[in-house]
């Protein structure tokens, strides 16, 4: 891993100084804020290559301001092979080349703030891309220090360890011949699930979140955040037909046993130190389950 950036190495939570003007959450500005979602790829193309980009968004800030919006929520702009519209992230601290550069992002952030607009980013931390440096290392061997960053299990005769079906298609387990093991992916096989049971993974994520907040972003929309804690028994799911021949993993992954513990830790280590907004995507949550968040 020599020569790779800090994001790709285990690290403790970054105890950074609050930037000038940033304070611990003391207001409820977000309660009355009007949020406008931007899908960068189709919003505005600034250079004529047929793909929307960050500079295109910057060029339309005055227009967005006239709409009366307060917050711009950006769908993922991180580096990604784009197997799932950017929700498969290969580097949390880099911008997808289709959209521009980090300098372009910083200019967008600065110009938005000048106009009284806030920027909220998608936060995708249930899984990464299989092209992320962590996963490339994880699959090399069972003794690799990154092995436990993901959820690996052995089945019998190279078969999946249980009958869970992916929310996209097929089995939720992908066989990897290198170590004769399967890794879990609730979504595409290109999106291996992170192992939130591993405190090193959580430290990596909190450090990354702090890095973006130190840049001045105004919060996160947390993608499928209710899925980060899995039932560690990994029992078979009920076969209902919804996943074909496979079982339903939903009862063992949604609103899992440690999800609130993890989010409370995230709040202590990162979120409570900034005047920001957060929104959590919690698929299929009941009113009672939602209230716990």
Feature-to-residue mapping (PLM):
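Catalytic cores of alpha/beta
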Residues: 288-292
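Hydrophobic residues within beta-strands of alpha/beta enzymes
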Residues: 72, 220-222
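Conserved protein kinase catalytic-loop anchor
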Residues: 217
